[in-house]
Design a protein with these regions (language model features):
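PAPS-dependent sulfotransferase catalytic core
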Residues: 1-84, 95-105, 109-156
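Alpha-helical packing segments of well-folded alpha/beta enzyme cores
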Residues: 62-65, 89, 170-174, 201, ...
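The conserved 3'-phosphoadenosine-5'-phosphosulfate
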Residues: 175-280, 284, 299-305
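PAPS-dependent sulfotransferase catalytic domain
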Residues: 56-70, 126-218
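Active-site rim elements
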Residues: 45-50, 80, 159-168, 190-192, ...
Length: 305
C-alpha cells in the first residue's frame, strides 16, 4: 500500500492548485489521482466524501488515491487544503510508520478571505449576487449574533465562508501541526512568493523535499484555478448546473475555454471602495495573529505589510 510522504495541507485560496500541478509535473513526484482527496476530513464535515473517507475505509482506501507513478517517485503527495483545520489528518498522518512532510502555503489573511469570497460568488456561483464583501465581513465578525441565514446567502459555500475569517488566523491552526511533526518537517511558504517568482519558489521547495530543482529551470508554470469576475452571474449559475451533466472530453474543454473568455472581466472582479475599507478593517484585526505567526515560526511576513 502506497501512502503519501508529503501532504500539502493548506491553506485554501493560496495557490495550491497551481502548486499541485507544478509539483505533479516533476518526474520524481507523484500526485494523488485528484488534487484534493478530502479523505481525512473530520466526521460530519460537509466536505467529507461519503463512502470514500478514512472513517469508512481506513488507510487502505487512502492508498487507492496514489497510482502507478508512486512506485518510482521520491515524493508522493496530495493537496487537501482544509486539512489545516481538521483533527483527523493531524492524528492519522502523525501516526503513519513514515512521518510525512507537511506543506502549508499562506496568503495575506485579508486577501485570502477576499479571494475566497469572490471565488465562491463568481467561479462557484454559490453566493447571492447582492451580498457585498463588506456586508459579508460584517456578518462574519458578528459570529452568529446577527442571525444571518448563511445557507440562504451562500448555498454550498456557507460552511466555508462562515468560518473564513477564523480560518485566516493561521497561528492558531498551524501550532498543533508543528507540535506533532516538528518544525523541521513543516514547511510554511508564502503565496506572495509563489506568485512573484514561481521558479524560485518551486526550486526552493524541490530542494527542501529532496527532488531535482533543475527541472524547474525551463518549466512553463501554467496557472490553475484562478478567481475571475463574471459578466452574467445568473447565466453562470445555470451553466455550472449544466456542466455537471456533460461528460468530460475535448469538446467540453474547448467549449469551457470559449465560455470563460466570454464571461471574464465582469464587475465581480472590480474592487469597490467599501470592499477596500472592509479589507483595511480585517488587516487591523489580523495583525496580532500575524505577529504571533512570524515570531513562533521565524517567518518574514513583510510581504503582508
Amino acid at each position: 500500500m502506497t501512502l503519501p510522504n508529503l501532504v500539502i495541507a493548506g491553506a485554501p485560496k493560496c495557490g495550491t492548485s497551481s502548486l499541485y500541478r507544478w509539483l505533479a509535473d516533476h518526474p520524481e513526484a507523484c500526485g494523488s489521482k485528484v488534487k484534493e482527496t478530502f479523505y481525512l476530513m473530520d466526521e460530519g464535515h460537509p466536505l467529507l466524501r461519503r463512502g470514500s473517507n478514512y472513517h469508512a475505509r481506513g488507510l487502505e482506501g487512502y492508498g487507492e488515491f496514489f497510482g502507478p507513478c508512486a512506485a518510482r517517485a521520491r515524493v508522493v503527495f496530495e493537496a487537501t487544503t482544509h486539512y489545516l483545520y481538521q483533527r483527523t489528518p493531524l492524528e492519522v498522518l502523525s501516526h503513519l510508520p513514515r512521518l510525512p512532510q507537511i506543506v502549508f502555503v499562506l496568503r495575506k489573511p485579508s486577501e485570502r478571505v477576499y479571494s475566497s469570497f469572490r471565488y465562491s460568488q463568481n467561479n462557484l456561483a454559490n453566493v447571492r449576487a447582492d451580498l457585498s464583501f463588506a456586508r459579508f465581513v460584517e456578518l462574519s465578525k458578528a459570529n452568529g449574533r446577527g442571525g444571518a441565514d448563511w445557507e440562504a446567502l451562500a448555498g454550498a459555500s456557507a460552511f466555508v465562508l462562515r468560518n473564513d475569517v477564523a480560518y485566516s488566523r493561521y497561528s492558531e491552526h498551524i501550532a498543533p501541526w508543528v507540535a506533532r511533526f516538528g518544525r523541521g518537517r513543516v514547511h510554511v511558504l508564502l503565496f506572495e512568493d509563489l506568485r512573484s517568482d514561481p521558479r524560485a519558489f518551486m526550486k526552493g521547495l524541490a530542494e527542501r523535499v529532496g527532488i531535482d530543482a533543475s527541472f524547474y529551470d525551463a518549466y512553463g508554470f501554467p496557472p490553475k484555478n484562478e478567481t475571475f469576475g463574471v459578466r452574467y452571474p445568473s447565466l453562470h449559475r445555470g451553466v455550472r448546473r449544466l456542466n455537471e451533466l456533460v461528460p468530460s472530453g475535448g469538446l467540453k474543454g474547448a467549449i469551457r475555454k470559449l465560455y470563460l473568455k466570454a464571461q471574464a472581466g465582469g464587475a465581480g472582479g472590480a474592487r469597490k471602495p467599501e470592499d477596500a475599507r472592509a479589507l483595511e478593517e480585517l488587516e487591523r484585526d489580523f495583525r496580532p495573529f500575524n505577529r504571533r505567526l512570524a515570531d513562533e515560526l521565524g517567518l518574514d511576513l513583510s510581504a503582508w505589510e
